[in-house]
């Protein structure tokens, strides 16, 4: 069976006393998947109740755990993560705690059904809406500002021997069960915009994947939306677009 290190590169752990008048000291530990004890922690704690917050993620991002209700990543696109927030009741003697981490972000996938064009050098995708790089480990929901956030992702397109369809992932935290985003996709050659696709009311769902599938490289394509009810692995808001 696969272990934590098969999915994630780092593990941030915080053990926070619930009564800081008796014990004000928090424990913060960062582990790497190259560590022999990755996914395990042995420590000494005074008797009492604590809140454990643990976040597994990719090494490309920094993670900060401030409290059981606030943690943040260094970027709005978090790639992949899983977390747990649970109470620990430390009694006298040896205590063993098992914690199961769960993914709690939302993911939007834009999948082309047509192949890359030779004269397209890069893609610029701009996402706008209520999403955040911060989340509440207790609830799993994002902590977003009242104003909408804008995030731009630049993708350089290679020159493979055989051009293929592409897939672009955007993973982030949302503050509610369902949030609507706007997405703007621009394809560039060396000196001009070739194709632009714009999507309004892109619904993403907490803990689910929403996939938009259609032609991105075909100039002049109209948008024809078809909603598809799918399993729990995906959200209920998959969309097909194109002619």
Question: What do the predicted segments below correspond to?
Answer:
Residues 32-34, 59-98, 191-220:
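Structured interaction patches on ligand/partner-binding surfaces of diverse proteins
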Residues 1-19, 62-129:
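Primarily secretory-pathway and cell-envelope proteins
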Residues 218-243:
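Intrinsically disordered, low-complexity repeat and linker tracts
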Residues 4-67, 120-208, 237-243:
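Tryptophan-paired
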């Amino acid at each position: 069976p696969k272990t934590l290190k098969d999915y994630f590169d780092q593990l941030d752990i915080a053990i926070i006393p619930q009564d800081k008048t008796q014990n004000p000291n928090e424990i913060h530990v960062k582990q790497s998947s190259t560590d022999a004890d990755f996914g395990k922690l042995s420590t000494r704690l005074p008797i009492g109740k604590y809140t454990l917050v643990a976040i597994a993620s990719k090494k490309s991002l920094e993670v900060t755990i401030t409290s059981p209700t606030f943690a943040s990543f260094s970027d709005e696109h978090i790639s992949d993560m899983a977390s747990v927030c649970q109470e620990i009741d430390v009694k006298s003697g040896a205590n063993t705690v098992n914690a199961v981490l769960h993914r709690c972000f939302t993911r939007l996938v834009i999948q082309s059904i047509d192949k890359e064009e030779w004269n397209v050098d890069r893609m610029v995708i701009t996402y706008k809406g209520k999403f955040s790089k911060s989340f509440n480990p207790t609830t799993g929901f994002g902590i977003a500002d009242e104003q909408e956030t804008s995030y731009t992702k630049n993708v350089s397109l290679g020159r493979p021997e055989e051009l293929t369809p592409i897939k672009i992932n955007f993973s982030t935290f949302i503050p509610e069960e369902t949030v609507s985003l706007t997405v703007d996709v621009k394809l560039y050659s060396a000196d001009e915009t070739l194709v632009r696709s714009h999507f309004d009311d892109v619904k993403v769902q907490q803990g689910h994947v929403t996939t938009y599938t259609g032609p991105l490289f075909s100039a002049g394509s109209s948008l024809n939306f078809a909603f598809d009810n799918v399993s729990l692995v995906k959200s209920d808001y998959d969309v097909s677009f194109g002619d």
